[in-house]
C-alpha cells in the first residue's frame, strides 16, 4: 500500500504545473548543464546561462581554472553571440562565491564584445575577490582570447639554446603552456558554432607531430583527438572540417585529413592510440634536437665550426652558447648537454 501511495504521488506530481521560470532556467545537477550545452547550438537559450553558471558553481565545477576552460569558453561565447543581452546575463550571473568569480571575469574578457572593458568596470564591484585580475585585463597585462597568439616554433639555434639549458621565451598565457585554452575554444564553438574557434584549434594540429616539446606534442595530440571525436559525434563539426581542409597549408592539411577519415569511419580510437604512442616514445627517447646534438658532437670539430660561424651572424653570445671555432669547448658542451 505504501508503495502504491508513493507511486501514485509520483504520477500525480508529474502532471502538476511547474513554475514557468523554474521550467525554463533551473538545473538540478552538473550533468543537466552539460546536456544543455551539448544541445545548445541546435536550440540556443541564452537566458539560461546565469542559471547554468550558478549550477556549476554549486557543484564546485569552477574551482579549478585548468579544468573549467570549456565552461569559460561557453559562457564567453554566449555573451559574445548576444551583445544586446550581455549586460542582463552578467547581472543575473552574479553574485558568485569568491572562488568562482574568476569565471565571470574571464568570460567577459573572452567574449569578444566591443564593450567588454566597460562591462568589466561596471561589474567590478560585484566581483571584489578578482579586483587585481580585472585590472590586469583592463590594462592589457592579461590578454583576451583573441589576443593570445599561437606559440611560434623555435628556430634551429633557439632549439640548441633550450637543449643546452637555456630557457625559451616565456609568455604569461600561451597555447603551449595553457592546455585549458583548447577547451575554451571548444566552449566558444558549442556556444554558437564559432568558426574562428575551430580555425584556432586547427592551427595547433601540426604540434601533433612535434619532436622537440612534450608540451606541444601533448596539446597537438589533444587537438587532433578532440577534433576527430567531435567530428564523429556532430555532423556540423565534420562538415566544417571538410569545408576547411582544401584551403589549409600542408602542415595542417595532412593531420586534418587523418581527422576527417577517422571521423567518417568512426575510428577515432585509432588516433588516440597513435598519439599516446608518440607521447610515450617522446618520454622514452627525448627531443630529436637533443639526439641530433649528440650526433653532431661526434661528427667532428669542422662541422661544429661551420655551425659556430653561422651562429655568429645572429649573435651567438645572446643565445648563451659557448662557441670556440675549431676548439673543444663547443664540442664538449654539446656532448655534455646531449647526455643529460
Predicted segment positions?
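N-terminal secretory signal peptides that target proteins for export/translocation
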Residues: 1-2
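Sec/Tat signal peptide C-region and signal peptidase I cleavage site
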Residues: 18-22
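Non-catalytic all-alpha helical scaffold/repeat segments
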Residues: 23-340
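Bacterial N-terminal signal peptides
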Residues: 5-16
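Hydrophobic alpha-helical segments
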Residues: 16-17, 96
Amino acid at each position: 500500500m505504501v508503495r502504491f501511495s508513493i507511486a501514485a504521488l509520483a504520477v500525480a506530481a508529474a502532471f502538476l504545473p511547474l513554475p514557468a521560470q523554474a521550467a525554463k532556467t533551473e538545473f538540478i545537477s552538473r550533468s543537466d548543464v552539460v546536456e544543455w550545452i551539448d544541445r545548445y547550438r541546435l536550440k540556443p537559450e541564452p537566458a539560461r546561462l546565469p542559471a547554468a553558471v550558478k549550477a556549476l558553481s554549486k557543484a564546485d565545477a569552477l574551482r579549478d581554472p585548468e579544468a573549467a576552460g570549456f565552461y569559460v569558453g561557453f559562457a564567453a561565447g554566449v555573451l559574445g553571440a548576444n551583445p544586446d543581452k550581455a549586460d542582463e546575463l552578467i547581472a543575473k550571473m552574479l553574485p558568485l562565491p569568491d572562488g568562482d568569480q574568476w569565471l565571470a571575469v574571464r568570460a567577459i574578457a573572452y567574449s569578444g564584445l566591443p564593450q567588454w572593458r566597460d562591462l568589466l568596470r561596471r561589474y567590478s564591484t560585484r566581483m571584489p575577490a578578482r579586483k587585481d585580475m580585472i585590472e590586469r585585463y583592463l590594462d592589457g597585462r592579461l590578454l583576451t582570447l583573441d589576443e593570445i597568439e599561437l606559440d611560434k616554433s623555435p628556430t634551429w639555434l633557439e632549439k640548441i639554446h633550450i637543449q643546452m639549458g637555456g630557457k625559451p621565451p616565456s609568455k604569461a598565457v600561451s597555447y603551449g603552456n595553457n592546455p585549458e585554452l583548447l577547451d575554451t575554444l571548444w566552449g566558444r564553438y558549442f556556444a554558437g558554432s564559432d568558426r574562428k574557434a575551430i580555425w584556432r584549434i586547427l592551427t595547433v594540429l601540426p604540434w601533433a607531430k612535434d619532436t622537440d616539446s612534450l608540451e606541444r606534442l601533448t596539446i597537438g595530440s589533444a587537438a587532433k583527438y578532440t577534433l576527430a571525436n567531435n567530428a564523429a559525434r556532430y555532423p556540423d563539426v565534420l562538415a566544417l572540417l571538410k569545408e576547411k581542409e582544401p584551403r589549409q597549408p600542408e602542415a595542417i592539411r595532412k593531420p586534418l585529413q587523418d581527422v576527417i577519415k577517422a571521423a567518417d569511419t568512426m575510428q577515432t580510437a585509432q588516433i588516440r592510440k597513435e598519439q599516446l604512442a608518440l607521447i610515450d616514445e617522446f618520454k622514452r627517447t627525448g627531443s630529436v634536437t637533443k639526439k641530433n646534438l649528440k650526433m653532431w658532437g661526434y661528427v667532428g670539430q669542422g662541422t661544429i665550426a661551420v655551425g659556430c660561424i653561422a651562429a655568429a651572424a645572429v649573435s651567438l653570445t645572446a643565445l648563451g652558447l659557448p662557441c670556440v671555432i675549431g676548439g673543444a669547448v663547443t664540442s664538449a658542451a654539446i656532448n655534455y648537454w646531449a647526455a643529460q
